[in-house]
Amino acid sequence: MTENRNRCVITGLGMVCAIGNSVDETWNNALKGVSGIKNTKTVDTEGCYATLAAEVHDNTLDECPHADEMDRVSKLCVKAAKEALADAAYTIPEDEKKRVSVIMGSCVGGVNSVEAYYRNGEKAEDVTKMPISAIANEVAYIYGADGIVTNIANACAAGT
């Protein structure tokens, strides 16, 4: 068997989802059969036939660096990336930054910012929180990844 030097190795895991705010919490809740689907608390469902959602409840998201400049989805990804880097015991060395890439999967981008802008006519600079590309850009910026930074957007399965 020949050695392939062009490979990707997953060395750390990070997770924030409706049944946990870390890999361990999510795994333990999954083993217990915990469902994250509940009556929504963050979306106004008046006039809607659906009131259930798999919401992520995490009160630590505003601890992200420059959190006020990010949409909620970017904060979730920054938190998961932080856990993955810690799990891998990895800090990006200065001379390796161009070799570290961030590739995210999402199909909507900063939808909370889009909705706030539509409903309230928020500040013009808030449009920078909206694009799908903002998610991977924020993770790369905060952790110093200067390699390829992109987002895969191909329907709801993009994040799986």
Give the positions of each predicted feature:
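Short conserved active-site loop signatures built around small residues
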Residues: G159
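Short beta->alpha junction loops
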Residues: N151-A155
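Conserved "HGTGT" condensation-loop signature of ketosynthase/thiolase-family condensing enzymes
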Residues: M1-V149
